[in-house]
Each structure stands twice: as structure tokens, then as C-alpha cells.
């Protein structure tokens, strides 16, 4: 370990630097020293060359003084002699412990006790400026930092080279996988991860190596596109409770403004509704979109308002109401049904269009019901089929009005621009 005042100049000129080699030369040559130190000959030759042109006492000093040292400050002047005294008193203490003791002792000194060392440090500074007027301090580089940089620079090269030969034709693929990209290069399989578990936390920035490919997963968006079709795992929303509706007066739904309702359907292939110039069945029988499963099926205010239900503002909500008209009759439904329960009917807004009820008179039931198995196909991702949810196909308008209302409710939420 180097001395703490190695970077500072010293006035101790009495002990020459070559005193120890002279004593060792008087004792005779050591054969084991030559075999253990291959650089011994080089050092001896350098000392011989230096001593040939200068006296032995100043040769080592001249070589060591090739790099100009900084002048010592007051603490270094005081600690130079104090460190020797502490080292003699405590030979077992480490140099770091000695430095801690010296620091505490220096802080404990008074200004009067520090004054002679401060004056000596100022004299050394002035002398240093006279001896080296163009001196500029250049700090030495730390060897430990260099060593770490070399290790970090050769980290990927050391890992890629042994694996490139073992992978065969895909050896060049490893370098692309080691860049930490979120997706692999198209057209190639993802290579093995380059990060080994025993590397430790020193290379934490390389944890992206061998990350799983993300191009097989869609981006999480709250609103799905109408062009995506029916999802494989649709979301379900519970039907509105009767307690959420007002008990008397005008039956309107308060959170209607929270939804983006657009009565005008977009122009394009997702136009769900009857065409005035053509047959009415192809538009009605189109399967509901994925957006309808999110908003229009389970208690959406604007979607359920367009299903042909008429509000009765003068009648309060009663537990046992008279039987509704045929277009309002629906079988008992579960919480995930496309059609709402009868007790939620007074909450509907009667200002919406009653176009599905007008279409019922023009529809042939026998022709319409043959398409019911297609609408309730299980692979379309719908929650229930007709026989599961209790839909009675022989009912007057139960299943027909349910499907027509489901298809028409998708129109109110398909407010996407054309893609």
C-alpha cells in the first residue's frame, strides 16, 4: 500500500533512496530473489545506468522526481512525523486506522498548535512556485477504473464468441438478441439468453438479454376497434340495479353524458342496420361487434335506450307491474344477458328511436328464426346460447326483439372514423 503522502513533496533528503539496495548488495546475491522476480534485472540495469551519470545518493531521487509532486499542506506536514510515531507505538494497526487516528488528533488541536505547521506549509508552497512556475496539477488515473472498463468492454464479446460456434448457422443471430430489443428480428427464431444467472448485480443493464418476444401480444387498449370482430374472452358488465333509477317523475338515466353516444353510424362495412333500398335482414342479422359486448349488452344507458322500450313517466315503479306490451316481454335473464331484466325497464329513455319495433311487422318469423343458430354460435364468444339463457323461440317476439335490439344497439357506439 502506498503512503498517504506519496503525491506530495518531502524535505527529507538525509536518507538516500538506494540505501536498501546497497545493504542487500553487501550481504551477497540471493539466488531465490532472481528466480522469483523476472523484472529484477531490468530494475538493476536502470539503477546502474542512472548511477553511472550521477552519484548513488541522488540517482533514485532524480528518477522519482521526474513527476512533480504537489506541495504538502499543514496537515501533511504535521502527519509526516506523527504517523511514524503512531506506527512505532501501534505496529499492528492498519494504515487506514492510523489515518483515522491522525485525523481525530488534528481536529483536536487548537489554532495556536496548528500555527507552526500552517506556516511551514505556506513556506513550502512559495518554494514550490519558485521551483516550478509552470506547474499544473495532473491527477493520476486510477488503475482500478481502467480494469473495470476493460471487463465491461469485453463482456459481450466473451459471451458471444463461444456461443457463436456452438449455434452453427444461427451464430450471427446471437448478437442481435444480446442488444436487449423488445422484439426479435423478423424471420428468425429468438436465440438463447446470453445472461447467465451467476453474473451478479454488476451488469444490471444487461438484464434485457433474452427477453421474451412481445410481438405476439396485442397492445392493451381500453377501446377495441370495431374491425377486430368478436373477442375470444369478452368482458361482462352487470345489469343496472333498480335502486339506481329514480322512484317517480321522469325516468331518465343520469350517467348518459359519461358515454360517447353517436346516433350516426360510420360509413363502411360495419354499418349495422336495415338498408332502405335493399332487404332488411342482412343488416339486422350481422353479428354484434366487440364494442357492443363492452357497452351495449349489459346495462349501457344509450344502448338499452334504443332497444324499443318506452318509458312511462307518469307511472311510479311498483313491485308488481301489469304485463308489458309484447315488445317488452322478455324471459328471465341472468346478470350477463344481452337483454335487461323487466324491473329495469322504467329507467329507459323514451326519446330514442323505436326503429326495431317498426321492423318487427315486416319480418317473417319463420325466415328470421332460421338464422338464430348463426347469431348464437358458441365460437363467436357470446356469453349464452338460446337454450342456456332460457330464450323461448316460440314466444311472440321475445327472441326476435332481443336479437334486433342487440344488433341495433351497436350502432350507437360505433362512432369510430373510417380506417
UniProtKB/Swiss-Prot annotation:
It comes from the Eukaryota. Residues 1-27, 303-356 are annotated as: Disordered. CDD domains: HMG-box_SoxF_SOX17 (cd22047). Its main location: nucleus. GO terms for molecular function: beta-catenin binding; DNA binding; DNA-binding transcription activator activity, RNA polymerase II-specific; DNA-binding transcription factor activity; DNA-binding transcription factor activity, RNA polymerase II-specific; RNA polymerase II-specific DNA-binding transcription factor binding; sequence-specific DNA binding; transcription cis-regulatory region binding. Disruption phenotype: Embryonic lethal due to defects in the development of the definite gut endoderm, aberrant heart looping and severe defects in vascular development and remodeling, including a lack of artery formation. Embryos die at about 10.5 dpc. Besides, mutant embryos display a severe defect in fetal hematopoiesis. InterPro entries: HMG_box_dom, HMG_box_dom_sf, Sox7/17/18_central, Sox_C, SRY-related_HMG-box_TF-like. Residues 68-136 bind DNA. It is found in: Nucleus. Residues 319-328 have a biased composition (Pro residues). Pfam families: HMG_box, Sox17_18_mid. One of its GO terms (cellular component) is transcription regulator complex. Keywords: Activator, DNA-binding, Nucleus, Transcription, Transcription regulation, Wnt signaling pathway. Detected in lung and testis. Detected in endothelial cells around small and large arteries in newborns and adults, but is barely detectable in veins (at protein level). Gene3D superfamilies: High mobility group box domain. A motif (9aaTAD) lies at residues 366-374. SMART domains: HMG. Residues 278-418 form the Sox C-terminal domain. The 9aaTAD motif is a transactivation domain present in a large number of yeast and animal transcription factors. Interacts with CTNNB1, LEF1 and TCF4. Acts as a transcription regulator that binds target promoter DNA and bends the DNA. Binds to the sequences 5'-AACAAT-'3 or 5'-AACAAAG-3'. Modulates transcriptional regulation via WNT3A. Inhibits Wnt signaling. Promotes degradation of activated CTNNB1. Plays a key role in the regulation of embryonic development. Required for normal development of the definitive gut endoderm. Required for normal looping of the embryonic heart tube. Plays an important role in embryonic and postnatal vascular development, including development of arteries. This is Transcription factor SOX-17. It comes from Mus musculus. The gene is Sox17.
Amino acid at each position: 500500500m502506498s503512503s498517504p503522502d506519496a503525491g506530495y513533496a518531502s524535505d527529507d533528503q538525509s536518507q538516500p533512496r538506494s540505501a536498501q539496495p546497497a545493504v542487500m548488495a553487501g550481504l551477497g546475491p540471493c539466488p531465490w530473489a532472481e528466480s522469483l522476480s523476472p523484472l529484477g534485472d531490468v530494475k538493476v540495469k536502470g539503477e546502474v545506468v542512472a548511477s553511472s551519470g550521477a552519484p548513488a545518493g541522488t540517482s533514485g531521487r532524480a528518477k522519482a522526481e521526474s513527476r512533480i509532486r504537489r506541495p504538502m499542506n499543514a496537515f501533511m506536514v504535521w502527519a509526516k512525523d506523527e504517523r511514524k510515531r503512531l506506527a512505532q507505538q501501534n505496529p499492528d494497526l492498519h494504515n487506514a486506522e492510523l489515518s483515522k487516528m491522525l485525523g481525530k488528533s488534528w481536529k483536536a488541536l487548537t489554532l495556536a498548535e496548528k500555527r507552526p505547521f500552517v506556516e511551514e506549509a505556506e513556506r513550502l508552497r512559495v518554494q514550490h512556485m519558485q521551483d516550478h512556475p509552470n506547474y499544473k496539477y495532473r491527477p493520476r488515473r486510477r488503475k482500478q477504473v481502467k480494469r473495470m472498463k476493460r471487463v465491461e468492454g469485453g463482456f459481450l464479446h466473451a459471451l458471444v464468441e463461444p456461443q457463436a460456434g456452438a449455434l452453427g448457422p444461427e451464430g450471427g443471430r446471437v448478437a442481435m438478441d444480446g442488444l436487449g430489443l423488445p422484439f426479435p428480428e423478423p424471420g428468425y427464431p429468438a436465440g438463447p439468453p446470453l445472461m447467465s444467472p451467476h453474473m451478479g448485480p454488476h451488469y444490471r443493464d444487461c438484464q434485457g438479454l433474452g427477453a421474451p418476444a412481445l410481438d405476439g401480444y396485442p397492445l392493451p387498449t381500453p377501446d377495441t376497434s370495431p374491425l377486430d370482430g368478436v373477442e375470444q374472452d369478452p368482458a361482462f358488465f352487470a345489469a343496472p340495479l333498480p335502486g339506481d333509477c329514480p322512484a317517480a317523475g321522469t325516468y331518465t338515466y343520469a350517467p348518459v353524458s359519461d358515454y360517447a353516444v353517436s346516433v350516426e353510424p360510420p360509413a363502411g362495412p360495419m354499418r349495422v342496420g336495415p338498408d332502405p333500398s335493399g332487404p332488411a335482414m342482412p343488416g339486422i342479422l350481422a353479428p354484434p361487434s366487440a364494442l357492443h359486448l363492452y357497452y351495449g349488452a349489459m346495462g349501457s344507458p344509450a344502448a338499452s335506450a334504443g332497444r324499443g322500450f318506452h318509458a312511462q313517466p307518469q307511472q311510479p315503479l311498483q313491485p308488481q307491474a301489469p304485463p308489458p306490451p309484447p315488445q317488452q316481454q322478455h324471459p328471465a335473464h341472468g346478470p350477463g344477458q344481452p337483454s335487461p331484466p323487466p324491473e329495469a325497464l322504467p329507467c329507459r329513455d323514451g326519446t330514442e328511436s323505436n326503429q326495431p319495433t317498426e321492423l318487427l311487422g315486416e319480418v317473417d318469423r319463420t325466415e328470421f328464426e332460421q338464422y338464430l343458430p348463426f347469431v348464437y354460435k358458441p365460437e363467436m364468444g357470446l356469453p349464452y346460447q338460446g337454450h342456456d339463457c332460457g330464450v323461448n323461440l316460440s314466444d311472440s317476439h321475445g327472441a326476435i326483439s332481443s336479437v334486433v335490439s342487440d344488433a341495433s344497439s351497436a350502432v350507437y357506439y360505433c362512432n369510430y372514423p373510417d380506417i
